[in-house]
């Protein structure tokens, strides 16, 4: 703890407010019981043991060393802590102007041993590691398990009980409103989140089980919060795993080209002024069962997905073990 005390004195010399110091000291308590992972500026979490990265380390790396995982939910001052084995992770879009995560658009590469994010950056300290990997795959380096998961997603079917689902807390950057307005008079859109909320079924009937809920719908409006190339979150993959057709906007109209079958997604191209072709395609799918069958049974994840996931997991293991040996 002496290193932390020296760091605290340095912070006071810099004139930083006590709140920053308190946050950093408290972050030392945000660690797993085995001591292998300590979280700083991290996502809200009820169980640090069950966090994906901790489970990855337990299963693939071992718990002999402590790793410090940092994210975007706090001051960059935390990155200056005198600790070893620093890993920065961003599942957020760091390129939204004036958003809080923008201060991390460099992925803290000069402050950590390893950084993970959505962007394609050529740096030995960086791995492109999109956050949807954590939602779709267990933290196990096993080709068979990865292949089985891909097959499961490709075979997923929805019940077609309802028209269209939309689950969102906001639309601050106007990514969802245009699509919603264009379709609301043609489809019954169930808005189960805070934004445009018109149903409590997600909670009262499905006990907040988002996947069981989405699997009841023909379509899912799953636009990103902001349109940035390469930024594809779990939203698109949630639609796939639930067997529903994603009505997607984001990623510069090119969501994970090596992974996602673009023909299995209906893309709302926000830069276009005329969306009549998109609307007509949705309506045909909604009304023509045979046409819907043909569309929804397409392969969603391309063959390269297995290699992509396996390579990312293997590389993460290698980098974590290498930094611990340094």
Name what the model sees in each region.
Residues 3-90, 98-326:
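Pol beta-like nucleotidyltransferase catalytic core
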Residues 93:
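Acidic, polar ligand-binding/catalytic clefts
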């Amino acid at each position: 703890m002496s290193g932390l005390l020296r760091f605290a004195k340095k912070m006071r010399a810099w004139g930083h407010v006590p709140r920053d110091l308190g946050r950093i000291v408290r972050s030392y308590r945000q660690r797993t019981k085995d001591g292998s992972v300590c979280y700083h500026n991290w996502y809200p979490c009820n169980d640090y043991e069950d966090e994906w990265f901790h489970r990855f380390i337990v299963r693939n790396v071992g718990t002999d060393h402590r790793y410090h995982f940092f994210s975007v939910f706090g001051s960059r001052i935390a990155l200056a802590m005198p600790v070893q084995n620093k890993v920065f992770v961003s599942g957020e879009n760091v390129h939204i102007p004036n958003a809080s995560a923008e201060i991390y658009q460099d992925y803290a590469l000069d402050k950590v041993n390893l950084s993970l994010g959505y962007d394609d950056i050529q740096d030995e300290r960086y791995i492109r590691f999109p956050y949807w990997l954590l939602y779709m795959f267990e933290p196990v380096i096993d080709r068979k398990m990865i292949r089985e998961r891909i097959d499961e997603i490709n075979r997923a079917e929805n019940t077609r009980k309802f028209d269209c689902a939309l689950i969102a807390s906001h639309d601050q950057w106007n990514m969802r409103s245009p699509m919603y307005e264009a379709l609301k008079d043609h489809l019954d859109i169930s808005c189960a989140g805070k934004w445009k909320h018109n149903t409590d079924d997600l909670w009262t009937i499905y006990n907040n089980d988002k996947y069981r809920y989405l699997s009841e719908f023909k379509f899912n409006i799953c636009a990103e919060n902001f349109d940035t190339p390469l930024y594809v979150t779990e939203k698109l993959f949630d639609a796939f795993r639930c067997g529903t057709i994603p009505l997607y906007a984001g990623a510069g109209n090119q969501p994970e080209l090596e992974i996602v079958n673009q023909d299995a997604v209906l893309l709302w191209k926000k830069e276009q002024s005329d969306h009549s072709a998109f609307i007509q395609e949705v309506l045909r799918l909604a009304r023509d069962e045979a046409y819907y069958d043909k569309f929804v049974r397409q392969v969603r994840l391309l063959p390269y997905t297995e290699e992509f996931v396996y390579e990312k997991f293997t590389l993460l293991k290698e980098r974590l073990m290498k930094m611990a040996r340094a």
